[in-house]
Swiss-Prot record:
SUPFAM superfamilies recorded: Thioesterase/thiol ester dehydrase-isomerase
EC number(s) reported in the record: 4.2.1.59
Annotated active site: H48
Cellular component GO terms, alphabetical: cytoplasm; membrane
GO biological process entries: fatty acid biosynthetic process; lipid A biosynthetic process
Listed NCBIfam families: fabZ (TIGR01750), PRK00006.1 (NF000582)
Annotated organism of origin: Clostridioides difficile (strain 630)
Main localization (coarse): cytoplasm
Molecular functions (GO terms): (3R)-hydroxyacyl-[acyl-carrier-protein] dehydratase activity
Gene3D superfamilies: Hotdog Thioesterase
Protein name, UniProt field: 3-hydroxyacyl-[acyl-carrier-protein] dehydratase FabZ
Family: Belongs to the thioester dehydratase family. FabZ subfamily.
Function: Involved in unsaturated fatty acids biosynthesis. Catalyzes the dehydration of short chain beta-hydroxyacyl-ACPs and long chain saturated and unsaturated beta-hydroxyacyl-ACPs.
Length: 142
């Protein structure tokens, strides 16, 4: 398990854009499971939507990407690199994410090479599938 301080050593995201609270499972370079406790205090709820707050789908995908970042950057050879989005495919949003929900994100790296990475990613609230898709990253030197 990784706490927020350990996550911040692996990925560069910071408040208000750090969307992972903890990592509950990590197989270095292979898979990771992360948690985001969604609260009414999230800055994006001020405008999306004040009368009916929903976590934007693009931020659910970003949260999944950050869990991928932890899996990728936990590999010793990737220290000092940055994983940046190179593509997203077959993404589907299946359910709303609202304040009070706990978002569980599961990612499995399907490709992890010197300069490219791909992952299958799924997010859940409880047992309900929220989002799924394929994410691709370029690994670049900082």
């Amino acid at each position: 398990m990784l706490n927020i301080d350990e996550i911040k050593k692996l990925i560069p995201h910071r408040y208000p854009f750090l969307l992972v609270d903890k990592i509950t499972e990590l197989e270095v370079g292979k898979r990771a499971v992360g948690i985001k406790n969604v609260t009414v205090n999230e800055p994006f709820f001020q405008g999306h939507f004040p009368e009916y707050p929903l976590m934007p789908g693009v931020l659910i995908v970003e949260a999944l990407a950050q869990v991928c970042g932890v899996a990728m950057m936990s590999v010793e050879e990737n220290k000092g690199k940055l994983g940046v989005f190179a593509g997203i495919d077959k993404v589907r949003i299946k359910r709303e994410v609202r304040p009070g929900d706990t978002l569980t994100m599961e990612v499995e790296m399907t490709t992890l090479r010197k300069n490219i990475a791909k992952a299958d990613a799924k997010a859940y609230v409880g047992e309900e599938l929220v989002c799924k898709g394929e994410l691709m990253f370029a690994l670049v030197e900082k």
